[in-house]
């Protein structure tokens, strides 16, 4: 069994809420790692001190949307000025919030003053960019969105560098937002990731003993980081790319919970923390509603040589083991640092003595079902091509699909859609057949690598829901055989989640 090397890199990614609510705890975790013989590389998400909608990234997206509105109404300068005043106010709020945090947490006056100047300069740069876009009527596209959103991670890094320096830990600000050479490609290709990892590693190694504090936002990504297949959650991916570039074997994802749970503990009080989970299970949970780890981060971590172990840990309980993402039987485990997992030091429940059961149950809200009855006597490949082309034109992806001879049902995520999009899609698909739209739905998913070996588990799941009079609109079982999903009314989602967890997890563990 291999032991962990002293002075080896460990990549520590801290979520926006952790940095927003517990910056002192974050700094102490990094300091402890360094004093303990590790070489921490710190990835920062944009700060958020409460709900995500009020976080820095959400505010910056407000700036982006406001700027788009300004550029779109060049014929109305009075309205432009009104909107620009609103935009300027949002940026001022961001700046004031960041500076107030510096004043609270940084003890040394010289570091406070320097960090305040840096934050003010960053916010002025953002304001100057938006002013130039307004003046010269620039194209406010995905690249522009990336540029504006990247300031959130920059500001977080300014704070964390100051927090570490305030504790006599030498630290260096590392901006990855525009470090990858722009190859003018419009589409993200697989070779982008190893190239980016190499560039990241080279830049971070240049810190020469100082703790690198790294922007979780990275670029330039072909097309756009936000609007490409990466999207929100990119800082997880950044952490894994940094680990690959540094040949690190450990990534720690720090959150405000003990690890990954059998269900969302905010909705299911008796949910248990899992000591370990496979990458496939983690990816399914992420896709179907649980904010676990970005799916591309999981994929790249397992493909790395040696594979990278990912720990999900609680920033408020740094001594806890948390949940480790370990490879399944089909993965190459020859170089996996398995000795890092010590169940005796874990807040998470050991599953070694438990009967065979699913791994977790999750819910994904803001789902709309499209039921389409073909106006032909039988389906054809042309029908599906037309339907999916219409969805693609509106940037709509399908979460679940169920088909019969002349009928297709699709569950789509409508969280970022306005009613006009649904109406437009409805009208266009109606040319191909009869369309019925069911809003306010939710996907309920049972996830587990052992599901394929659990005879009758699907029947038991649906029987539990039926006994409690929960109507099922759609049923789907993934080709991977580790997920069984159904679509139910959103009003029944929390009740159904608790019923399934109680019957399949709590009672099973007694």
Swiss-Prot record:
Entry-linked Pfam families: AA_kinase, ACT_9
Induction: Expression is positively regulated by the fusaric acid cluster specific transcription factor FUB10. Expression is also positively regulated by the secondary metabolism regulator LAE1.
One GO process term, biological-process aspect: lysine biosynthetic process via diaminopimelate
Biotechnological exploitation: Fusaric acid is phytotoxic to plants such as cotton and banana. It has been shown to induce programmed cell death in plants. In addition to a mild toxicity to animals, fusaric acid exhibits acanthamoebicidal, antioomycete, and antimycobacterial activities.
Gene disruption phenotype: Strongly reduces production of fusaric acid.
Keywords, in A-Z order: ATP-binding, Kinase, Nucleotide-binding, Phosphoprotein, Repeat, Transferase
Gene3D superfamilies: Acetylglutamate kinase-like, VC0802-like
Pathway involvement of the protein, from the record: Mycotoxin biosynthesis
Domain ACT per the UniProt entry, residue ranges: 372-440, 446-510
GO cellular component: a single term: cytosol
Annotated TM spans: none
PROSITE patterns: ACT, ASPARTOKINASE
Keyword Nucleotidyltransferase assigned: no
Reactions catalysed, as given in the entry: L-aspartate + ATP = 4-phospho-L-aspartate + ADP
Enzyme Commission code: 2.7.2.4
Gene Ontology MF terms in the entry: aspartate kinase activity; ATP binding
Membership in a protein family: Belongs to the aspartokinase family.
Protein task: Aspartate kinase; part of the gene cluster that mediates the biosynthesis of fusaric acid, a mycotoxin with low to moderate toxicity to animals and humans, but with high phytotoxic properties. L-aspartate is suggested as fusaric acid amino acid precursor that is activated and further processed to O-acetyl-L-homoserine by cluster enzymes aspartate kinase FUB3 and homoserine O-acetyltransferase FUB5, as well as enzymes of the primary metabolism.
Xref: PANTHER family: ASPARTATE KINASE, ASPARTOKINASE
Protein's recorded name: Aspartate kinase FUB3
Gene name for this UniProt entry: FUB3
């Amino acid at each position: 069994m291999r032991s962990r090397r002293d002075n080896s890199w460990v990549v520590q990614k801290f979520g926006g809420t952790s940095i927003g609510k517990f910056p002192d705890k974050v700094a102490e975790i990094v300091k402890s790692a360094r004093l303990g013989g590790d070489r921490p590389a710190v990835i920062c998400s944009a700060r958020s001190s409460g709900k995500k909608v009020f976080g820095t990234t959400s505010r910056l997206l407000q700036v982006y949307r406001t700027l788009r509105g300004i550029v779109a109404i060049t014929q109305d300068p009075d309205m432009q000025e009104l909107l620009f005043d609103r935009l300027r106010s949002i940026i001022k709020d961001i700046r004031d919030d960041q500076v107030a945090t510096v004043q609270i947490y940084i003890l040394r006056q010289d570091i406070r003053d320097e960090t305040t100047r840096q934050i003010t300069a960053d916010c002025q740069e953002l304001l100057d960019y938006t002013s130039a876009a307004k003046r010269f009527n620039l194209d406010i596209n995905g690249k522009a969105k990336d540029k504006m959103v990247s300031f959130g991670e920059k500001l977080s890094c300014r704070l964390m560098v100051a927090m570490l320096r305030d504790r006599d830990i030498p630290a260096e600000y590392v901006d990855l937002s525009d470090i990858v050479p722009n190859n003018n490609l419009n589409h993200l290709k697989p070779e982008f990731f190893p190239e980016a990892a190499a560039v990241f590693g080279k830049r971070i190694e240049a810190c020469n003993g100082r703790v690198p504090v790294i922007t979780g936002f990275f670029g330039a990504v072909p097309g756009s980081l936000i609007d490409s297949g990466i999207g929100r959650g990119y800082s997880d991916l950044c952490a894994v790319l940094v680990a690959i570039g540094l040949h690190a074997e450990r990534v720690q994802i720090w959150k405000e919970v003990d690890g990954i749970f059998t269900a969302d503990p905010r909705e299911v009080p008796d949910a248990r923390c899992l000591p370990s989970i496979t990458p496939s299970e983690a990816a399914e949970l992420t896709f179907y509603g649980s904010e676990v780890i970005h799916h591309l981060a999981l994929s790249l971590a397992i493909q790395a040589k040696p594979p990278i172990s990912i720990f999900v840990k609680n920033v408020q309980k740094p001594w806890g083991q948390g949940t480790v993402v370990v490879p399944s039987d089909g993965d190459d485990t020859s170089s996996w640092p398995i000795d890092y997992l010590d169940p005796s030091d874990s807040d998470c429940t050991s599953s070694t003595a438990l009967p065979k059961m699913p791994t977790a149950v999750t819910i994904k809200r803001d789902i709309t079902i499209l039921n389409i009855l073909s106006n032909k006597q039988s389906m054809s490949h042309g029908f599906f091509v037309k339907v999916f082309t219409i969805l693609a034109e509106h940037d709509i992806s399908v979460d679940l699909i169920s088909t019969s001879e002349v009928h297709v049902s699709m569950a789509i995520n409508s969280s970022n859609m306005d009613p006009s999009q649904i109406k437009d899609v409805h009208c266009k698909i109606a040319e191909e057949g009869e369309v019925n739209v069911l809003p306010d739905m939710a996907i309920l998913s049972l996830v587990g690598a052992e599901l394929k070996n659990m005879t009758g588990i699907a029947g038991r799941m649906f029987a539990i829901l039926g006994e409690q009079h929960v109507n099922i609109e759609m049923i789907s079982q993934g080709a991977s055989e580790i997920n069984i999903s159904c679509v139910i009314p959103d009003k029944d989602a929390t009740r159904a989640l608790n019923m399934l967890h109680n019957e399949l997890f709590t009672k099973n563990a007694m």
